[in-house]
C-alpha cells in the first residue's frame, strides 16, 4: 500500500511525518528543517512562496504574505472581528465569509486555499523524501475545533490534492506519540498550547488502548496572542515617546510582530531580552527607532490575563473526567508556547507535578498523526483509539431552546436518535436547526446548518413522530437525518455547509490547484536551468582564462566558439528564453568537456589550482538556488 503521511497543520508551523520500519519519522523539508512555517506569500511577479522563504520576505511584502490563517479556517467573519484587526494583510467580508485579499494577484482567497498551499508544500517535501507520490494523509486539528472547522480542514486537504483519510485531534495525536510503547496504564493530561489554539485532553493510555476521557479548550488562545501583547506594549511605548502612532503602518506592524515573536522565544531561556528596530519609520523630524528591554517579569505582567485563560480548560477537563489533579499520572506539554516558563509554572501549580518534557513539543503531534496513518494503512497493529466529540450537538426546539442529542465528551464514532413532534396542529413540515455548543439557547450556540422535512400528514400537534438521528464519524464530522415515522419520509444533511466553501467552489479550487501545480513545477524547472546556465557561464569564463597559453594557441577555434556560446547563453538568460538556454547550455557543456579532455591529454595543469573548485561546488550552489525557489 502507498505511504500515508501524518500532518500537523499548525497555526505558526507545520510538520509532516511517516512510519518507516515500524517507527514514526519526521520528514525533513527542502530547506533542511523539520518544521515549515505556515506562511504563504505572492511576489510582485505572481510567484508563489511557501514556508521559510515566504516568512523571510514578509516585512517587505506584508500585504501579500498570509500567516496564522488557521485562526480563520471554517469560521464566519462575525466570529473573528478581533483577529481581523491584528493582521498586516487585508481581510474582506464576502457575504459573511472571510476572504484574504492579495493585491499582487488582484484576487481574494479563502483560508482553505492558503492552508492548501502549506499542505501541498509538505506533501512535495514528503514526495522527495520517500521517492514516491503521496496522495493520502491524516491531518490533525485542535480538539476544540467545531464541525465547520473540521470540514474546512478536509476541504483544504482536498484542494491540495490529498485524500484525507482521517481528521484526528491534536492532543490525541500527541498521546499516541507519547504512549506508543507504554505497557502500564496511565492517566495523562495533554496540555497543548500552539500558535493559535489551546486544547486540554485527559486520556487513559496503556497497552495499545488510547481512550479520551474528556477534552476542553479555547480556539482563540495561542502564541499569537502572547506576541500581540508585546506588539501592543511596543506600540503604546512608541506613541508615548514620539507622539504619533504606528498602527496604520503595515510594514512596521510586520516588523513589530516578528520582533515580538523573537523576544517571546528568547525569554524562554533568558531573564530579559533587547528589542532593537532601527528605522521603524520616519517623519519630518527624521528616522525613528525602537530600542526596548523586555524582562521576563514584564512579559508575564503583560500576559497575565492569557495565563488566567489557560487555567479554565484544565479545570473543565478535570471536572468532565471526574478526576482530581492528584489522579493525573503524567502531564505532556505540546506546542511551542509551552516553552514559556510561566506556562510550565502554571501547569505545575494546577496539577502539583512537574510536566513531562521527554517529547519534542513541535514534532509530537505530527508523529502521532503518522502513527494513526500507520494504523489506517495496516502498518501499525494493536492500537485502539477512542476519541470524543469536544462540544455537545443538538437541535433547536420550541422557544429557541437547544435540546442536546449528543453530549460533549461522547466517544466517537457514535449514533444517537431522539423523537420530536410538531408544535402546531396540521403542521405540514418541520425545520431542523442543527446546533453545536453548551449554551441553553440556540442563539448562543454555533449554528451548523438547517434542513426541512416536508410531507407530514395533517394531525393534532404532538401526534406526528419525527425521529432525528445524529451520526458522527471517526473524523468528528456530523450528518443528521430526520424521518417521519408515520410516512417513512426522510431528509438528511451532512454538515458541510458549515464550511466556508460550497462543494462546487472546492472542486473548482482543486482544479485550479492542479493547474497551478503544473505551472509551478515548470517555473521551478526553468529557475533550476537558468541557475545552472548562469553557473556554467561563470565556470567557462574562469576555466578559459586559466588555460595554458600553448593550449589556447592550439585550439583558437574551440576557445572562440566557447566564448561565443557563453555570450549567447548570457543573452538567453537575460531574455528568459528557456528553450534557447537549454540548447546553448548543452553546447557549452560539450565544449567545456572537449577543452577539459584536451587539457588532460596535454597533462598541463591550469594556472590556478583552485579552478576546479568552482566545479566541485556545483551541487552546493545548485542546492542554494533550489532553496530559494
From Swiss-Prot:
Record's keyword annotation contains Plastid: yes
Region (Disordered): 599-629
Cross-referenced InterPro entries: ATPase_NBD (IPR043129), Chaperone_DnaK (IPR012725), Heat_shock_70_CS (IPR018181), HSP70_peptide-bd_sf (IPR029047), Hsp_70_fam (IPR013126)
PROSITE patterns xrefs: HSP70_1, HSP70_2, HSP70_3
UniProt key word Nucleotide-binding: yes
Gene Ontology cellular component list: chloroplast
NCBIfam families: PRK00290.1 (NF001413), prok_dnaK (TIGR02350)
Gene Ontology terms, MF aspect: ATP binding; ATP-dependent protein folding chaperone; unfolded protein binding
Species classification: Eukaryota, Haptista, Haptophyta, Pavlovales, Pavlovaceae
Acidic residues compositional bias, start-end: 619-629
Origin species: Diacronema lutheri (Unicellular marine alga)
Keywords for the protein's UniProt record, in alphabetical order: ATP-binding, Chaperone, Chloroplast, Nucleotide-binding, Plastid, Stress response
PANTHER family listed in its UniProt record: HEAT SHOCK PROTEIN 70KDA (PTHR19375)
Secretion signal, residue range per the UniProt entry: none
Source species, domain of life: Eukaryota
Family indicated by similarity: Belongs to the heat shock protein 70 family.
Biased composition (Basic and acidic residues): 601-612
HAMAP family from the UniProt entry: DnaK
UniProt-annotated location(s): Plastid, Chloroplast
Protein name in the entry: Chaperone protein dnaK
Amino acid at each position: 500500500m502507498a505511504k500515508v503521511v501524518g500532518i500537523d497543520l499548525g497555526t505558526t508551523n507545520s510538520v509532516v511525518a511517516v512510519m518507516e520500519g515500524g517507527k514514526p519519522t519526521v520528514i525533513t523539508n527542502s530547506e533542511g528543517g523539520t518544521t515549515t512555517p505556515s506562511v504563504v506569500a505572492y511576489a510582485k511577479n505572481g510567484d508563489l512562496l511557501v514556508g521559510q522563504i515566504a516568512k523571510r520576505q514578509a516585512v517587505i511584502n506584508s500585504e501579500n504574505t498570509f500567516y496564522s490563517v488557521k485562526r480563520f479556517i471554517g469560521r464566519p467573519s462575525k466570529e473573528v472581528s478581533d483577529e481581523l484587526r491584528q493582521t498586516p494583510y487585508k481581510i474582506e467580508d464576502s457575504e459573511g465569509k472571510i476572504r484574504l485579499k492579495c493585491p499582487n494577484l488582484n484576487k481574494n482567497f479563502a483560508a482553505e486555499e492558503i492552508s492548501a498551499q502549506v499542505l501541498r508544500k509538505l506533501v512535495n517535501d514528503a514526495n522527495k523524501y520517500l521517492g514516491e507520490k503521496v496522495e493520502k494523509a491524516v491531518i490533525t486539528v485542535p480538539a476544540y475545533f467545531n464541525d465547520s472547522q473540521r470540514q474546512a480542514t478536509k476541504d483544504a486537504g482536498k484542494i491540495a490534492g490529498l485524500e484525507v483519510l482521517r481528521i484526528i485531534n491534536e492532543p490525541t495525536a500527541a498521546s499516541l506519540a507519547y504512549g506508543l510503547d507504554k505497557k502500564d496504564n496511565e492517566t495523562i493530561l495533554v496540555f497543548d498550547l500552539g500558535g493559535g489554539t489551546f486544547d486540554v485532553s485527559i486520556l487513559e493510555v496503556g497497552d495499545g488502548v488510547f481512550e479520551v476521557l474528556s477534552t476542553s479548550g479555547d480556539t482563540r488562545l495561542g502564541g499569537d496572542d502572547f506576541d500581540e501583547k508585546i506588539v501592543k506594549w511596543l506600540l503604546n511605548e512608541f506613541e508615548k515617546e514620539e507622539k504619533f502612532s504606528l498602527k496604520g503602518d503595515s510594514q512596521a506592524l510586520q516588523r513589530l510582530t516578528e520582533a515580538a515573536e523573537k523576544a517571546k522565544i528568547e525569554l524562554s531561556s533568558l531573564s530579559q531580552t533587547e528589542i532593537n528596530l532601527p528605522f521603524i519609520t520616519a517623519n519630518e523630524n527624521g528616522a525613528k527607532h525602537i530600542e526596548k528591554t523586555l524582562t521576563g517579569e514584564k512579559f508575564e505582567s503583560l500576559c497575565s490575563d492569557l495565563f488566567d485563560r489557560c487555567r479554565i480548560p484544565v479545570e473543565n477537563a478535570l471536572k468532565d473526567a471526574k478526576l482530581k489533579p492528584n489522579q493525573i499520572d503524567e502531564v505532556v506539554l505540546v506546542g511551542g508556547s509551552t516553552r514559556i516558563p510561566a506556562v510550565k509554572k502554571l501547569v505545575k501549580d494546577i496539577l502539583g507535578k512537574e510536566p513531562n518534557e521527554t517529547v519534542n513539543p513541535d514534532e509530537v503531534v505530527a508523529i502521532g498523526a503518522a502513527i494513526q496513518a500507520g494504523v489506517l494503512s495496516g502498518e501499525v497493529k494493536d492500537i485502539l483509539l477512542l476519541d470524543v466529540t469536544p462540544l455537545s450537538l443538538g437541535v433547536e426546539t420550541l422557544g429557541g431552546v437547544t435540546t442536546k442529542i449528543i453530549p460533549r465528551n461522547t466517544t466517537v464514532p457514535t449514533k444517537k436518535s431522539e423523537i420530536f413532534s410538531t408544535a402546531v396542529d396540521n403542521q405540514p413540515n418541520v425545520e431542523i436547526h442543527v446546533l453545536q455548543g453548551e449554551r441553553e439557547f440556540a442563539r448562543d450556540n454555533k449554528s451548523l446548518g438547517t434542513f426541512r422535512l416536508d410531507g407530514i400528514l395533517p394531525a393534532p400537534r404532538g401526534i406526528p413522530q419525527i425521529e432525528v438521528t445524529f451520526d458522527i464519524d471517526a473524523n468528528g464530522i456530523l450528518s443528521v437525518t430526520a424521518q417521519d415515522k408515520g410516512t417513512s419520509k426522510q431528509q438528511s444533511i451532512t454538515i458541510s455547509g458549515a464550511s466556508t466553501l460550497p462543494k462546487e467552489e472546492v472542486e473548482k479550487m482543486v482544479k485550479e490547484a492542479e493547474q497551478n501545480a503544473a505551472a509551478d513545477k515548470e517555473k521551478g524547472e526553468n529557475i533550476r536551468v537558468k541557475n545552472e546556465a548562469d553557473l556554467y557561464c561563470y565556470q567557462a569564463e574562469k576555466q578559459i582564462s586559466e588555460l595554458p597559453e600553448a593550449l589556447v594557441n592550439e585550439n583558437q577555434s574551440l576557445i572562440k566558439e566557447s566564448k561565443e556560446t557563453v555570450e549567447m547563453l548570457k543573452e538567453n538568460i537575460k531574455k528568459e528564453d528557456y528553450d534557447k538556454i537549454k540548447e546553448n547550455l548543452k553546447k557549452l557543456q560539450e565544449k567545456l568537456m572537449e577543452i577539459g579532455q584536451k587539457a588532460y591529454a596535454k597533462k598541463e595543469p591550469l594556472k590556478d589550482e583552485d579552478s576546479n573548485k568552482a566545479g566541485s561546488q556545483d551541487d552546493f550552489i545548485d542546492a542554494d538556488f533550489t532553496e530559494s525557489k
